[in-house]
Amino acid sequence: MSQFFYIHPDNPQQRLINQAVEIVRKGGVIVYPTDSGYALGCKIEDKNAMERICRIRQLPDGHNFTLMCRDLSELSTYSFVDNVAFRLMKNNTPGNYTFILKGTKEVPRRLLQEKRKTIGMRVPSNPIAQALLEALGEPMLSTSLMLPGSEFTESDPEEIKDRLEKQVDLIIHGGYLGQKPTTVIDLTDDTPVVVREGVGDVKPFL
């Protein structure tokens, strides 16, 4: 049976944030709010927790996970960022974007896209997500909470509780969220490529 925390969406209670981070550090899988709906998260190097997430979402081998980072400095530790990419991201983070970048040796090999050695990176603006990452002190392995058979990210924490309370360690209720996905931008080459248009404005990358 999972725990269920009500955390204020604008002013997260630090006591609950610390408890949530402790669950992650001990190998737990959590449901938490982001800019684009709820997500599943775990510690970056915890293979068992990652496999639990794969079972919950019925993900295929080689699924492209995302690393949630608190800021660009942390993002730059886990991915190769040139000057052009850095300027673009600096002007558009935190926010509703996922950036595809080449991963550094800090990223476990099993998380990198097999052929291109890339990884999705995000700097969320959601206050709860930011507070979690600040307290954790490292990126969190993450994927959108899109349950099998659904085309949309889950947005209702009460429904999530009904469906997942026996499969995850913690569900954070951070309000009812939108369902539109992030905009995905590939920054591995000199020219940015819009892979998916979502909530984030694509104009800065065209």
From Swiss-Prot:
GO terms for molecular function: double-stranded RNA binding. PROSITE patterns: YRDC. Residues 14-200 form the YrdC-like domain. SUPFAM superfamilies: YrdC/RibB. One of its GO terms (cellular component) is cytosol. It comes from the Bacteria. InterPro entries: DHBP_synth_RibB-like_a/b_dom (IPR017945), Sua5-like_dom (IPR006070), SUA5_domain (IPR052532). Belongs to the SUA5 family. NCBIfam families: L-threonylcarbamoyladenylate synthase. This is Uncharacterized protein YciO. The lineage of its organism: Bacteria, Pseudomonadati, Pseudomonadota, Gammaproteobacteria, Enterobacterales.
